[in-house]
């Protein structure tokens, strides 16, 4: 059965401790990092300054 005792067999160090596909917490962190990066990209393009053309057409 999956549970807290199943996580004891994995001994990760470094960044693998937080981002892995074996534990529920690791998968959750991967999803949150993906959603967060997508949100940051959307905000960047939405909030960046709009450049005005140098010469306005009449």
Curated annotation (Swiss-Prot):
Originating species: Bos taurus (Bovine)
Main location: mitochondrion
Disulphide bridges, residue numbers: none
Cell compartment(s), UniProt: Mitochondrion membrane
Keywords assigned: Acetylation, Membrane, Mitochondrion, Transmembrane, Transmembrane helix
Protein name: ATP synthase F(0) complex subunit k, mitochondrial
Gene: ATP5MK
Entry's transmembrane regions: 23-45
Pfam families per UniProt: ATP_synth_reg
């Amino acid at each position: 059965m999956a549970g807290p005792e199943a996580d004891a067999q994995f001994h990760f160090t470094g960044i693998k401790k937080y981002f892995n596909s074996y534990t529920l917490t690791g998968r959750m962190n991967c999803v949150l990092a993906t959603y967060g990066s997508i949100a940051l990209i959307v905000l960047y393009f939405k909030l960046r300054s709009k450049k005005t053309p140098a010469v306005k057409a009449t």
